[in-house]
Amino acid sequence: EFGIRIDIDEESKSVTVSDNGIGMSKEEAISNLGTIARSGTSQFLDSLTGDQKKDSQLIGQFGVGFYSSFIIADEVVVESRSAKLSAGEGVRWSSKGEAEFDVETIKREEVGTSVTLKLKPSEAEFADGWRLRSIVKKYADHVAVPITMKQVTTEEDKEPEDEVVNTAKALWTRSRSEVKADEYKEFYKALSHDFQ
């Protein structure tokens, strides 16, 4: 079963989002993530109007959604392995959000991709389990695959268990009678970026 996992390292102030999807090869990582040095990013910046609604729609158009991670992270590390390749053919792509990135071949047992955000000191709040849960519920509750995190526990001697933090059922796959009015409103807000 496909899934997404979020792991938090409170000590190092980092967040890792992993999936068990098809993964990427080294060439695909360079092609898909290497746009940081391409003109698309500067073209995107030139297209900004100052109108929050219009500008947020440009993100997908220019493929810079991934690069918004540098708003909260000093460094982003992506590790991946394509389902078509062996464990010895994984890839690690890393960047500090400047006009360059590093790529290396790594050994990776799991097929899929992990994205680690090494948070800026001013953004350490995102390494908090409760904070991330609320973000997942607000913006990704309708994602059709389960998003798993460790439970937040106050018992120091107890190993936290995994729990699914989203409903993992897209609104459009449920019957109208199952969907509450608040769910429609939250979905609309997330989709349209209308947070008023």
Stretches found by the model and what they are:
Residues E1-A127, S134, D141:
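GHKL (Bergerat-fold) ATPase N-terminal catalytic module, capturing the glycine-rich phosphate-binding loop
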